[in-house]
């Protein structure tokens, strides 16, 4: 299982727009055959900081996700909303086994 944790910091005035744009990516990702989980989390202390927890069955599923229309549209719109570049960390998911 391929897991990615992405930190996204959004300009305060763009939070509502971010949620609208990212909802389309979230809903699209959940329909992908290789997707196991796609959570959007908000930091309770810093309301402009979000974490995306993505789990895909393998590297091929991750690559397929990055070619989808919903992902490409989201990334394009996201750039101008962010207060700093995204930070990503990748993990190997061990449990639960899929």
Curated annotation (Swiss-Prot):
Q: Which UniProt keywords apply?
A: Cytoplasm, Isomerase
Coiled-coil ranges from the UniProt annotation: none
Subcellular localization, per the record? Cytoplasm
Q: Does the keyword Nucleus apply?
A: no
ABM domain ranges (all copies): 2-91
In the record, the note on similarity to other proteins reads:
Belongs to the LsrG family.
Q: What is this protein called?
A: (4S)-4-hydroxy-5-phosphonooxypentane-2,3-dione isomerase
């Amino acid at each position: 299982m391929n897991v990615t944790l992405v930190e996204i910091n959004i300009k305060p005035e763009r939070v509502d727009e971010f949620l609208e744009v990212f909802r389309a990516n979230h809903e699209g990702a959940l329909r992908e055959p290789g997707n196991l989980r796609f959570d959007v989390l908000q930091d309770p202390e810093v309301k402009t900081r979000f974490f995306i927890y993505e789990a895909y069955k393998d590297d091929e599923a991750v690559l397929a996700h990055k070619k989808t229309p919903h992902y490409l549209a989201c990334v394009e719109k996201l750039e101008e909303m962010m207060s700093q570049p995204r930070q990503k960390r990748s993990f190997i998911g061990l449990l639960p086994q899929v």
